[in-house]
Curated annotation (Swiss-Prot):
CDD domains: Ribosomal_L16_L10e
Gene Ontology annotations of biological process type: translation
Entry similarity comment: Belongs to the universal ribosomal protein uL16 family.
Gene Ontology cellular-component terms listed: cytosolic large ribosomal subunit
Protein name (database record): Large ribosomal subunit protein uL16
Keywords: Ribonucleoprotein, Ribosomal protein, RNA-binding, rRNA-binding, tRNA-binding
Gene: rplP
Subunit note: Part of the 50S ribosomal subunit.
InterPro entries, per the entry: Ribosomal_uL16, Ribosomal_uL16_bact-type, Ribosomal_uL16_CS, Ribosomal_uL16_dom, Ribosomal_uL16_sf
UniProt-listed Pfam families: Ribosomal_L16
PANTHER family for this protein: 50S/60S RIBOSOMAL PROTEIN L16, LARGE RIBOSOMAL SUBUNIT PROTEIN UL16M
Disulfide linkage: none
GO terms assigned for molecular function: rRNA binding; structural constituent of ribosome; tRNA binding
């Protein structure tokens, strides 16, 4: 699973998720991508479940790019712990995904296989998503 190697601060503020993503809105690596239609925290377990679903469907063909990384830690207090006494212990890691962010990209397979793999991945995520192609949202061309 994806976790940071080291962090400066173990406990972070929750932050705000207003507006659309500033970067990562183009399909830059593969031919097809999975775009978020709403903002949400995506846990490292959800990212891994989506990755496994895609790679199992595509078998040995193609390549998957994960464009999000869980940099933010989230905390929780134990069950039955009274209020106060500081912030809880870090529980897991999340990626802050804003709307219009491309989360996953797929390349090297046919359109039907790519769309089905991304559909299976979207079922593992807690947000509404859209499958987009490089032509729809733009992206860097691979020609030199």
């Amino acid at each position: 699973m994806l976790v940071p190697k080291r962090v400066k601060h173990r406990r972070e503020f929750r932050g705000k998720m207003r507006g659309a993503a500033k970067g990562g809105r183009n399909v830059d690596f593969g031919e097809y991508g999975l775009e978020a239609l709403e903002s949400h925290w995506i846990t490292n377990r959800q990212i891994e479940a989506a990755r496994v679903a895609m790679t199992r469907y595509m078998k040995r063909g193609g390549k998957v790019w994960i464009r999000i990384f869980p940099h933010k830690s989230y905390t929780s207090k134990g069950v039955g712990v009274r209020m106060g006494n500081g912030k809880g212990a870090p529980t897991g890691w999340v990626a802050v995904v804003k709307r219009e962010k491309i989360m996953f990209e797929v390349g090297g397979v046919s359109e039907a296989v790519a769309k089905e793999a991304l559909r299976l991945a979207s079922n593992k995520l807690p947000i509404r998503t859209k499958i987009v192609s490089r032509e729809e949202v733009g992206g860097q061309s691979n020609e030199g």
